[in-house]
């Protein structure tokens, strides 16, 4: 056992002992602030073979990897042999990964398992942080896949969350010992605020002598103000920034990972007292908040990138956000406040969000997607192994063998899998779909377009632009206009300025989604044996990935050039390294004499 220079709390001691003294799977349920992530990293440190630590966000994977190196390893006199894998789901990863501990997202881990890298055979432990996301319509699918893979292969599972509904059901699915505590090392007090009075969940009432936010700034505390949308977050930021200059920041999904990590570090250093945020901060990112104030309890419903209405925050979502308050090492207590207009509303809010149960958990997986992922993972699978895997899911644990056979037959008819009489195997086409992380529904749509007689490239592009994932990433903007502007090399800021709601990070996410879909379609086309068409799609993928026309691709891939300079060189008649070096005077004006010397030596 590693030697530690810190004292563990009783909950951590019990959980670590269970991990070390047995090989059981563990389901750990404990409030935010009890040190679950630190505990899981200690477990990773104690595991001799490979560990995959999965989380909901890339930013969180990067943060945990950083903490593993800079905080956990020094405390236990250990070596942080780890890496964060945060590339896109469709992108390849190293065939021979050296690091022992991998921090990544659920989806990336799922994609990795499908690709049969040699190093995945040595995975001993799978850590699933924020396991409550198994009930999420989008995130839950990957978690269910990961659990099925792990249970089928004897990989140990450690699952954790502060807000687990149906604890016993999840424990049964992963065959886990439950380790539970309700005690927070830092007490969290919940209250409803009406005017200048705080009505606490235990019945106490406190009258505030000054504005609450003003008091927090004066006492140098950090407050998170939760609101429903980015636009509202930025509006509240402007209001508070006028009152408390340079002490306010906003945080939402439109910010890139680097900016999010910078805000976290600057807040820890005391630069900000007020962070206005959307639900982007509900998933484990460890800001030092003393208080969380709910400006709103609604969330927007977005379908195909467009706003369609509102929904109330669920008790799980509320507690995930509320639990950000009161962090060990920063405060001795935490405070969570909901704004209300009158006593009647306050009592209703208390009943809904204070001391409430989380209800039941429902799976949202699609059976044919699960089956294709499973068969692709194993390359070949017999019916009994497939049925055994369904027992370890929320979505299919009680499914009939007849329905599974029916869906397997549909996958066969779609030529995604084949059968040899005793089991099922994945076809080249099916493997291309699974490794591209495509839904079966989308794959069939693309297949129908690709196999048309004399299909034109424009038809394939239209199918990509009409894909649900692309539309969801578009924020309701005109995808055709953005797509054409991007591959022609139009400046990013110019593209964003022409939209209603996009940020630069939104544009980046849309480009990533377009790249993912295009590369996947290229993979499928190649698997179908359509080489000429595949070559065209490979070129289209590169145009989207780099944001330049084909005539500038040779330039943009040169070290140090980048998109903006490649476009400028192209507009000056330079299209490749040979032309760049033969027209040095023009090149020097655009990329500088030093870079010309480096590239042309």
From Swiss-Prot:
GO terms for molecular function: ATP binding; ATP hydrolysis activity; helicase activity; nucleic acid binding. Transmembrane segments: none annotated. A motif (DEAH box) lies at residues 129-132. Its EC number is 3.6.4.-. Residues 17-182 form the Helicase ATP-binding domain. ATP binds at residues 30-37. Residues 208-375 form the Helicase C-terminal domain. Keywords: ATP-binding, Helicase, Hydrolase, Nucleotide-binding. Pfam families: DEAD, Helicase_C, Helicase_dom4_arc. It is an enzyme of class 3 (hydrolase). InterPro entries: AAA+_ATPase, DEAD/DEAH_box_helicase_dom, Hel308-like_dom4, Hel308_SKI2-like, Helicase_ATP-bd, Helicase_C-like, P-loop_NTPase. PANTHER family: ATP-DEPENDENT DNA HELICASE HEL308 (PTHR47961:SF10), DNA POLYMERASE THETA, PUTATIVE (AFU_ORTHOLOGUE AFUA_1G05260)-RELATED (PTHR47961). This is Putative helicase 7. It comes from Sulfolobus islandicus filamentous virus (isolate Iceland/Hveragerdi) (SIFV). The lineage of its organism: Viruses, Adnaviria, Zilligvirae, Taleaviricota, Tokiviricetes. The gene is SIFV0007.
